[in-house]
Amino acid sequence: MNYQRIIKLSTLVAILALCTTASAGPPQQAKSTIVLADQGSFLVGGNVVTNPGVFDPVNPTTAGQSIHGDAAYVQYQMPPNARNLPLVMWHGGGQFSKTWETTPDGRDGFQNIFIRQGYSTYIFDQPHRGRSGRSTTNGNAINAVPGPTTTGEQGIFVRFRIGIWPNYYPGVQFSTDPDALVQWWLQQTPDTAPTPINVAVAAVSALYDKIGPAVLLTHSASGILGWLTGAANEKVKAIYSYEPVQCAFPIGEVPPPVPTSGGAVTGLGIPPADFEKLVKIPVAIIYGDNIPSDQSPNGNLDLWRGRMALCKQMVATLKAHGGDATFVHLPEIGITGNTHFPMSDLNNATIGSLLSDWLRAKGLDKRGQGNT
């Protein structure tokens, strides 16, 4: 046996292994395997429009033909021995369910993070967005994607507080890898038709009717829709809202508009009986960093100051009515650099831990008996 040759080969293998390890960069934390008991998708809600007349299958015209639309496409994943209350995740304006999936820089998003923690997840595209594009209001026609406007890609870079284009904020929790920015830009999604508030709320309420009690996560433009859904359906057991653009108050208790350089920010008045339904469930509102503390000449940023101020008042109003409400401005608890998308920021594991702790503190993380 040629022992000298074996020793040389062993040395070469060891050197190659060392080089591979060195070139691979810092070691990546091992992730547990995602195990699912079930996954699937369905559509909920929607409307049907039927033309008058009788359909002729031999000589078809528009007569008697129908369009089903205005539904929400839902994708679900269920781990074994799942916790009692699933998490329903609602994207914001110009977004679809991708918000909650893999982050723009390729890390686990909230969908995977919380499946690993034993929660079933339901992510969906609201009517007329993403995979829910079919609309009864304009037939098959899909509106042309608008060209660049004041909220084109560079505009939303500023509006969503990644930085002041083309510069990133120092310490921002968004990857500065150019590919990550392109991935984030690509997930912007137009509506295929205008979406009345009642259509969106009806679809998500239908989702709750189908799946039963669950916690609702909202983001940005879906914030106000979440308040209305919580008021409409008692199966919404808690609402955790990331940077809502509008908050709700009982009619008669709506605070004055907050003037900003981007326009006045207003609260939405809802019937007191509906507001009381929100009083009965745990509510939390979370805002990130780089929001002006005083009036700013940059309207895209100053709007957030007004929105945060009014939503902080919503929490105070819920508490005044006896509710269980929490307001968190992340820099005030030592978490800095977050953009308008904390669920996909670089520190989204930390942001997710805040949600996990809140669910535990409110008794919403149980398995077996309870949480119904």
Regions found by a protein language model. Name each.
Residues G223-E234:
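Short glycine-enriched nucleophile-adjacent loop
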Residues P26-A82:
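N-terminal cap/lid segment of alpha/beta-hydrolase-fold proteins
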Residues N84-G93:
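Short beta-strand element of the alpha/beta-hydrolase
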Residues Q246-G322, T326-V328:
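The feature captures the conserved acid-bearing segment of alpha/beta-hydrolase catalytic domains
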Residues N233-P250:
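A conserved short beta-strand
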Residues R107-G133:
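Conserved alpha/beta-hydrolase
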Residues P194-V215:
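Conserved acidic catalytic loop of the alpha/beta-hydrolase fold
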Residues G337, F341-T372:
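Catalytic active-site module of serine/aspartate enzymes centered on a nucleophile-bearing elbow/loop
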